[in-house]
Swiss-Prot record:
Residues 108-118 have a biased composition (Basic residues). Residues 105-124 are annotated as: Disordered. Belongs to the universal ribosomal protein uS12 family. The gene is rpsL. It comes from the Bacteria. The modification 3-methylthioaspartic acid is found at residue 89. With S4 and S5 plays an important role in translational accuracy. Keywords: Methylation, Ribonucleoprotein, Ribosomal protein, RNA-binding, rRNA-binding, tRNA-binding. The keyword Ribosomal protein applies. InterPro entries: NA-bd_OB-fold, Ribosomal_uS12, Ribosomal_uS12_bac. One of its GO terms (cellular component) is small ribosomal subunit. Part of the 30S ribosomal subunit. Contacts proteins S8 and S17. May interact with IF1 in the 30S initiation complex. This is Small ribosomal subunit protein uS12.
Length: 124
């Protein structure tokens, strides 16, 4: 416990907040190459086969990114755009792949929340 005189001399040091998306190096998105595309199971109590990919980013960091939406066309060596955003029931998955950009196609037959999944407006 410092004395008041010590606080007057030195003051308190601010705590530095830890960055949640360190691999993006301050960018909103990063481009990367898929090194492995696979499925994994979520934590309890959920049950599914979640689609994820290991991606080597242009910042030379390899991360695990979630592939949102139903169905995808990704395989090894696909170029993808990665954004921040964790998946709560997949430990270690702190990034998401942006659908509809670079080699990633949008979700087919998507009617609502289309912009999140890179789906074009359907011709009526």
């Amino acid at each position: 416990m410092p004395t008041i005189q010590q606080l007057v001399r030195k003051g308190r040091r601010d705590k530095i907040a830890k960055v949640k998306t360190a691999a993006l190096k301050g960018s909103p998105q990063r481009r990367g190459v898929c090194t492995r595309v696979y499925t994994t199971t979520p934590k309890k109590p959920n049950s599914a086969l979640r689609k994820v990919a290991r991606v080597k980013l242009t910042s030379q960091v390899e991360v695990t990114a979630y592939i949102p939406g139903e169905g995808h066309n990704l395989q090894e060596h696909s170029m993808v755009l990665v954004r921040g955003g964790r998946v709560k029931d997949l430990p270690g998955v702190r990034y998401k792949i942006i659908r509809g950009s670079l080699d990633t196609q949008g979700v087919k037959n998507r009617k609502q929340a289309r912009s999140r999944y890179g789906a074009k407006k359907e011709k009526s």
